[in-house]
Amino acid sequence: KRLQSDMDRKLTAYHEAGHALVASVLPYADPVHKVSIIARGSAGGYTLKLPIEERKLQSKKEFIDDIAMSMGGYVAEKMIFGDITTGPSSDLQVATNLARAMVTRWGMSDVIGPVALASSGGKREWGESVDKEYSETISTKIDEEVRRIIDDGIKSAEKVLLENRKALDAIANKLIEVETLEKDEYEKVIIAYGIMPKKKNEEKIMKI
């Protein structure tokens, strides 16, 4: 199934190229296995990344790179077209949910500290028994931390895409041409721009 317009194809190509390139450059993100601009459900395209080896735990550094990768499409759209579409809406949701879990469930916020403010189901742990004003203060701090984490992810993605603009263009143009890049084809493109694919001994120890 081909996208409806040339503009849609170009926009989706840069969006997915943004995801893929950020994942390939940042050290704690999983390697890219496939990139496509063929529509899949409600998404205009998709980027598939898989860990090299199965792991049961994930580190804060890996979560931070995952958020940057999630925002790579948003950043690419803004950088290339000076605007954003509805395309990154699911990416924003993924990044926000992950950032919030880092803060409230896994104690990964330096500001909030190593406390669990939500259960595994996402329910607040400080509940009705806690003073309302105190509860609102915590909620505000959580929101501020979530925003900061996402903003940091955006800045990280921006740095990658600005420093590797030629690679971004090359990935997007190749996607416009062939629509889908499998792992080997994708890696040939990035290698041409000095970006080395991730190998097993380079991968980090912890991952969910």
Predicted regions and their residues:
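Interdomain coupling/hinge region of P-loop NTPase helicase/AAA+ cores
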Residues: 1-3
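Soluble catalytic regions of large protease machineries
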Residues: 8-14, 20-208
